[in-house]
């Protein structure tokens, strides 16, 4: 990778159609797991004008009023009137849910050692570009969309729930130097003028979301570049669970295994192992073992022990990379049950993750972001690790 380059990441607001779907799916998960922590949940949602469809597989001993939950989620997001093109009070709700396949359950529901809920590879990433140890482009893109939602609720009611941001950061010598371009698109009511939209987004959103030191007279701003965005939300585009996996993670800076998070209980390693990968990578960086770290973990369905573990530090490690990989295996348990217990994942914490990113957050529910407990232990383990044969460890 070159040391001087431009890198772009995007974010979307909670009112984006795909994020409505994610929040509904995670709302269903939370409602079930609050009553039955051992439930198996895999729920997908589709939203379109006047309609929400919830489908998937659930095995539980509890009852959840899914249509009521769907409506309350849509209304909380801000779609409460037909003038917005979508109304949680009146939209139709369809539910198509069956039990989990017994073939899958045999491998996962093992009382002695819970197997992975599916095969696959998951990635975790961290870098020292921001205090949250997240890449700068996605960090600032999320800052804009969170601020956009806040301004909508508190200051400018003509802003509608659907919105997007995009931030391009210029890197020099591999470090963020300035913001080169900012794109913001927001749904709005029909009567507001383009001039008012431009002023409000520039002064009340962007100016309060981005560091002034990264903005200069060459920074380019594109605010509602198509001119008008009245027909937004599910009226403008259909929304599906799991279509914003790059927004959910690292904005493209770190790799992604392809598995979405929302609507899945922690037995699905698509979610739990990705959270653990982030936790490990962040701990590596916080411990001063590297400035950038990516962790890959892979699993076979029904098997508890990971098939492989890989640690990559992109030439930024302060100790040999093989030692870091050995220290990771010594310090962290990577079996699904170990991950679930260590990160305390059997709680109704997931709807909050379904907008503005699963990583780089400071709320108490995001246990995978806490690194103080294992930081020193990992550093000590890396210093004392004894590599075998002097070769670089890629899989263990």
Swiss-Prot record:
Which Gene Ontology BP terms does the record give?
Answer: one-carbon metabolic process; S-adenosylmethionine biosynthetic process
> Which residues of this UniProt protein bind K(+)?
44
Q: Which GO terms describe its cellular component?
A: cytoplasm
An example Pfam family from this entry, by short name, is S-AdoMet_synt_M
MF term (GO), any: magnesium ion binding
Question: Cofactor: bound how, per the entry note?
Answer: Binds 2 divalent ions per subunit. Binds 1 potassium ion per subunit.
Q: What is its main location?
A: cytoplasm
The UniProt catalytic activity note for this protein reads:
L-methionine + ATP + H2O = S-adenosyl-L-methionine + phosphate + diphosphate
Record flagged with keyword Electron transport = no
Binding residues for Mg(2+), per the UniProt record?
A: 18
**Names of the cofactor(s):** Mg(2+); K(+)
Which keywords does UniProt give here? ATP-binding, Cytoplasm, Magnesium, Metal-binding, Nucleotide-binding, One-carbon metabolism, Potassium, Transferase
EC nos: 2.5.1.6
| Positions of L-methionine binding | 57, 100, 237, 268
Residues the entry annotates as binding ATP: 16, 162-164, 237, 243-244, 260, 264
Keyword Transferase listed? The answer is yes
Q: Where is this region: Flexible loop?
A: 100-110
Compartment(s):
Cytoplasm
Pathway(s) of this molecule: Amino-acid biosynthesis; S-adenosyl-L-methionine biosynthesis; S-adenosyl-L-methionine from L-methionine: step 1/1
What Gene3D superfamilies does this protein's entry cite? Answer: 3.30.300.10
Q: Which InterPro entries match?
A: ADOMET_SYNTHASE_CS (IPR022631), S-AdoMet_synt_C (IPR022630), S-AdoMet_synt_central (IPR022629), S-AdoMet_synt_N (IPR022628), S-AdoMet_synthetase (IPR002133), S-AdoMet_synthetase_sfam (IPR022636)
What assembly does the database describe for this protein?
Answer: Homotetramer; dimer of dimers.
Q: Which family does it belong to?
A: Belongs to the AdoMet synthase family.
Entry-linked NCBIfam families: metK (TIGR01034)
Physiological role: Catalyzes the formation of S-adenosylmethionine (AdoMet) from methionine and ATP. The overall synthetic reaction is composed of two sequential steps, AdoMet formation and the subsequent tripolyphosphate hydrolysis which occurs prior to release of AdoMet from the enzyme.
Q: What is this protein called?
A: S-adenosylmethionine synthase
């Amino acid at each position: 990778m070159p040391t001087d380059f431009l890198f772009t990441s995007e974010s979307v607001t909670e009112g984006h159609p795909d994020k409505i779907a994610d929040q509904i799916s995670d709302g269903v998960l939370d409602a079930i797991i609050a009553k039955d922590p051992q439930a198996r949940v895999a729920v997908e949602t589709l939203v379109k004008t006047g309609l929400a469809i919830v489908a998937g597989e659930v095995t539980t001993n509890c009852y959840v009023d899914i249509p009521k939950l769907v409506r309350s989620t849509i209304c909380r997001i801000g779609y409460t009137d037909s003038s917005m093109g979508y109304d949680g009070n009146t939209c139709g709700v369809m539910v198509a849910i069956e039990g989990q396949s017994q073939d899958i359950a045999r491998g996962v529901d093992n009382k002695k050692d819970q197997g992975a809920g599916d095969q696959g590879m998951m990635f975790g990433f961290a870098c020292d570009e921001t205090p949250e140890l997240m890449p700068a482009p996605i960090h600032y893109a999320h800052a804009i969309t969170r601020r956009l939602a806040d301004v909508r609720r508190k200051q400018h009611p003509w802003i509608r729930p659907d919105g997007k941001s995009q931030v391009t950061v210029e890197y020099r010598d591999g470090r963020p130097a300035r913001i080169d371009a900012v794109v913001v698109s927001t749904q709005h009511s029909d009567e507001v003028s383009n001039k008012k939209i431009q002023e409000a987004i520039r002064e009340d959103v962007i100016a309060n979301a981005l560091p002034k030191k990264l903005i200069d007279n060459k920074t380019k701003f594109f605010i509602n570049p198509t001119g008008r965005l009245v027909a937004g939300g599910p009226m403008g585009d259909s929304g599906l669970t799991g279509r914003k996996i790059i927004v959910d993670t690292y904005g493209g800076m770190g790799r992604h295994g392809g598995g979405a998070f929302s609507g899945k209980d922690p037995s699905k390693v698509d979610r739990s192992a990705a959270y653990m990968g982030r936790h490990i990578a962040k701990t590596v960086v916080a411990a001063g073992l590297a400035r950038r770290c990516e962790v890959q973990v892979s699993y076979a369905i029904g098997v508890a022990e990971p098939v492989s573990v890989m640690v990559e530090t992109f030439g930024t490690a302060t100790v040999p990379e093989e030692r870091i990989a050995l220290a990771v295996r010594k310090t962290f348990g990577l079996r699904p049950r170990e991950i679930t217990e260590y990160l305390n994942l059997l709680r109704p914490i997931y709807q909050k993750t379904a907008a503005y990113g699963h990583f780089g957050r400071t709320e108490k529910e995001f246990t995978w972001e806490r690194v103080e407990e294992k930081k020193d232990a990992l550093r000590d383990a890396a210093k004392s690790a004894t590599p075998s044969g002097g070769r670089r460890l890629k899989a263990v």
